Amino acid sequence: MSSVKFLAFADLHHYPEVFYTFAPERLAAIRQRAIDEKVDFVISLGDFGGGKPLDLLAEYAAFPMKTYHVFGNHDTDNMTLTEAIKAFDMPGKGYYFFDCNGFRFIILDNNYVNIDGSILHFELGNYFPHPNTREILPAEQVDFLKETVGASPYPCILFSHSSIERECDQTPGRPFRSAIINRQEIIDVINQANSRSPGKVRMAINGHYHRDFLRILDQVVFLDLNSASMEWVNNPHDHFDRELTAKHTYAANTVIYNEPLCAVITLDHDGTLQIDGMKGSFYKNVTREMTDNPPCDRSGRPCTANIQSVKMKMFYR
C-alpha cells in the first residue's frame, strides 16, 4: 500500500526583536522530530519569519529531507515579493506543486490585497491599511489550481496560509479576516474535481490563525494547523517580566507555547489519514483567558497549546 508521511508546522514567527519565540531552538526540535519519524518531507505553512530570517532559512533548507514553504502574510513584511522568492528559494511566483509517493501537493499563495482595484501581492506592509480587501487568491492561481488538479494522476493535497474552509465574516464594518475572500471559487474547483473523480482532492491544510481545528466538508479533510510558537492577542497583558517585554517589542501581545508544535501526517491511498499531533503547555502558564481578550477567535475556536491527533479512513465513491 503506497503512503506518504510528512511533517507540517506553521507560524514559527522568527523575529527576535519583536517576538519571544526562541525560533532556532524550535526549528532544531522540529528537525529532530522529522528525522526520528523518517518523514518524506517537511513543509512550513507560512509566517516563518517577519524580518529577514536568512540564517534560519538556511538551517531549514539544510534539513536532511526535502523542505518546502508556503508564503504567509508576514513573510514579506520587510521584503519585496522578488526578494522573498529568492530568500525562501520558492519555485516560480510563490505557488507551485510537487508529487511525492503517488500524491500531488499543491501550494497556494493567498497573500494578495485589492488596493483601488489593483490586485497586489503583500509586500513591505502594503496590506496593513486594507483589512477589508486582503487575502485573495488571484484568478491566475484559481486557473492554476483547476489545471493542476485536473491534470494530476494522483490524489491532491492543498496547502495555503489562510483558510479555505473558514467562512468569510461579512458583518458590515468588520474585515474579511476569517478566510480567503474568494474561497468559494476554490471550493467550487475542489467539488467539481471530486464529482468527476471521487477522492481527487482529499485534504487542505492552512496556518495563520494559530488554532487547532479539524473539519470535514464534502469528504475533504480541512486542518486548521496551530502555530509552532505562540498566539497573538490584540490587547497587551502584564504577565511577563519587564525585562522580556523590553527586549521583544510585542511580547506582551502574545501568549507563548513552550513546545514547538507540529504534526506528522500520514496518508495512504486507501483513504487512511493519520495526524500525530502534540500536547503542549503555555510559557509561564499564561493563557489567553488570563488576558483582556476574547477567549475564542471569530470562528469560535479557542486558543490551545495543542495539535490534535486523529486517525480516520475516508471512503470515496
Segment roles from a protein language model:
Residues 189, 211-317:
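Binuclear metal-dependent phosphoesterase catalytic core
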Residues 14, 49-50, 75-76, 164, ...:
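Short active-site segment of divalent metal-dependent hydrolases/proteases
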